[in-house]
Amino acid sequence: MPPLTALASGCYHDPTMDQDRLAQALERVERMLRGYVERSPYRLNPDPVTVRHVRDGLAEHLVLHGRMYCPCREVTGAPERDRPNICPCTTHAEEIARTGACECGIFVSADYAKEAR
């Protein structure tokens, strides 16, 4: 296994990953996240460390698997089984309604965001 190096978030990744592809994936993930919170009732977690960790995980999954799979869930390689875990995952609304945040913590309710500030 190749050595691991840190992304800006402190997450670790395979340094053999094409850095240009990773940078493009990060831009694409950031556009998706901004667009989603603009058109949904949810907000990004006010904790920038959480957002960076999840964003970096989404970007790595995009490079490695071609989809923005939620980094808090296992990617099996079976498209039908993995599809519900593409961000925003199919369970995020239920999780936010129940706890104020989705499982990975990137999306939160407006009330959660207000209380966390």
Give, region by region, the residue ranges found by the protein language model.
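Leucine-biased recognition of intrinsically disordered, low-complexity hydrophobic segments
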Residues: 4-7
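Short, positively charged and aromatic/hydrophobic N-terminal segments
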Residues: 11-13
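Long, distal/terminal scaffolding or interaction modules
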Residues: 18-117
